[in-house]
Amino acid sequence: MADRVLRGSRLGAVSYETDRNHDLAPRQVARYRTDNGEEFDVPFADDAEIPGTWLCRNGLEGTLIEGDVPEPKKVKPPRTHWDMLLERRSVEELEELLKERLDLIKAKRRGTGS
């Protein structure tokens, strides 16, 4: 019989308690603006630290209108294969290896060409 009473009810998903006579948690609203000029509000807890940027629903990043300007992120140049190679060997060593490999290839060509 208990199954019939709960049928159709979303247990745990819906609170059946009324919202009257309850104090909501203190909040602060931060306003952001995207590069295309769209403004949107994001509610935060009163004691939360407000981030300088927030992702808008349209996919663009919004900047906090009133508040600290976010520091630009440091962008490291991408490490190329050549950079990683130079970390392990000097240019002189690489030239020596190249000469050895070229001599080896030339010797193979002479041996198979005759």
Curated annotation (Swiss-Prot):
Similarity field: Belongs to the RNA polymerase-binding protein RbpA family.
InterPro entries: RbpA_sf, RNApol-bd_RbpA
HAMAP family the record matches: RbpA
Described purpose of this protein according to its UniProt entry: Binds to RNA polymerase (RNAP), probably stimulating transcriptions from principal, but not alternative sigma factor promoters. Partially restores transcription in the presence of rifampicin (Rif) in vitro; overexpression leads to an increase in the Rif tolerance in vivo, with smaller colonies. Seems to act by removing Rif from its binding site and preventing its further binding. No longer stimulates transcription in Rif-resistant RNA polymerase (with mutations in rpoB).
Self-association state and partner proteins as the record states: Monomer. Forms a complex with the RNAP catalytic core, specifically with the beta subunit (RpoB); its binding site may overlap with that of Rif. May bind free principal sigma factors.
Induction: Constitutively expressed during growth, increases slightly in stationary phase (at protein level).
Pfam families: RbpA (PF13397)
GO MF annotation: an example: bacterial-type RNA polymerase core enzyme binding
GO biological process per UniProt: positive regulation of DNA-templated transcription; response to antibiotic
Protein name according to UniProt: RNA polymerase-binding protein RbpA
Superkingdom of the source species: Bacteria
Keywords, in A-Z order: Antibiotic resistance, Transcription, Transcription regulation
